[in-house]
């Protein structure tokens, strides 16, 4: 099941932190971004296997792995060995970068294994809120 939400952005741009997209990609597709994204991106693997290329390094994505990409970081990712299922969120805001840096995300980060329970719960809450905006 693929579910993607790109909220209509209006007055949210004045907020210090705002959602620009959230989704479940099942299956995930081959993505090449030579100039990176304009937004910050968090992505975690909920099933299958994929590959992420940042710079000259390749990172294997398996269930429980996650990565963070700040804006403008060139990257490529694609499924490997069949299906790859991802949960992802993209966001912007004047203070998004500073907030993330204060949390230790001051550049590209990759983790081969995270405890997915809390991130999945948070992701599901954000997805539910984005599905029924109060705008």
Regions found by a protein language model. Give the residues of each.
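Alpha-helix boundary/capping detector
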Residues: 45-48, 78, 90, 115, ...
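A short hydrophobic beta-strand segment most commonly corresponding to one strand
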Residues: 41-44, 66-69, 82-99
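Amphipathic alpha-helical segments enriched in hydrophobic/aromatic residues interleaved with Lys/Arg
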Residues: 99-135
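Amphipathic, well-ordered alpha-helical segments in soluble domains
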Residues: 18, 41-44, 95, 118-122
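A generic short alpha-helical patch detector that favors 3-5-residue windows
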Residues: 14, 88-91, 114-118
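Short C-terminal domain-edge/linker segments immediately following a structured domain
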Residues: 50-56, 74-75, 83-84, 98-101, ...
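Generic protein-terminus/edge-of-domain signal
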Residues: 1-65, 73, 79-81, 106-110
